[in-house]
Amino acid sequence: MPKVPVYNVKGEQVGEIELKDSVFGVPVNVAVMHQAVVNYLANQRQGTHSTKTRGEVRGGGRKPWRQKGTGRARQGSIRAPQWIKGGVVFGPKPRDYSYKLPKKVKRLALKSALSSKVRDNEIIVLDEFKLEQPKTKKVAELLKNFNAKSALIVVPQGEKNVELSARNMPNAKALYANLLNTYDVLKYEKFIITKDAVAIVEEVFA
């Protein structure tokens, strides 16, 4: 079982915690993590892009000039693809990019991501992190105390003020422990998690 220090919000060590091998000590599988990240990003895509074909562009019903005798190339419509303001050939149409990844693959990817954070000493366990009201300054101070350029902050469900405090920071994100995903774990430099959230992660994803 990997042992990691426990800190307070000021960055001072106040103890140690043992993390479960089944969640934080598995072999790091890069290929599976890649699959999970690609799946996550694909599922986020709106897919509302659209272009018009020659049949959908307004106008172009009349033949621009007669077929023969002008010396110019024959044309059937001013909305054909080769014309300016013509339709698009094989352009994008609205589609759903989402697809399902097996639960076991998703879970293995998340465990690999968490284990990589432990291996690279990029995990920071806090004794607690609670805010009485949303304060972005408090989250900024937390990152500064741990020299973190960016961080994912994982808290138990219900810590709404922490989530709101990190919302308008480009280099930080707060996430409930039960909503943890591979993409967010890997995206940020530091993985900051409270002791209570560790227990939830170990229970949900073990």
Curated annotation (Swiss-Prot):
One of its GO terms (molecular function) is structural constituent of ribosome. SUPFAM superfamilies: Ribosomal protein L4. Gene3D superfamilies: 3.40.1370.10. The keyword Secreted does not apply. One of its GO terms (cellular component) is ribonucleoprotein complex. Pfam families: Ribosomal_L4. Keywords: Ribonucleoprotein, Ribosomal protein, RNA-binding, rRNA-binding. It comes from the Bacteria. GO terms for biological process: translation. Residues 60-71 have a biased composition (Basic residues). Residues 45-76 are annotated as: Disordered. Belongs to the universal ribosomal protein uL4 family. HAMAP family: Ribosomal_uL4_B (MF_01328_B). One of the primary rRNA binding proteins, this protein initially binds near the 5'-end of the 23S rRNA. It is important during the early stages of 50S assembly. It makes multiple contacts with different domains of the 23S rRNA in the assembled 50S subunit and ribosome. NCBIfam families: rplD_bact. Part of the 50S ribosomal subunit. PANTHER family: 50S RIBOSOMAL PROTEIN L4, LARGE RIBOSOMAL SUBUNIT PROTEIN UL4M. This is Large ribosomal subunit protein uL4. The gene is rplD.
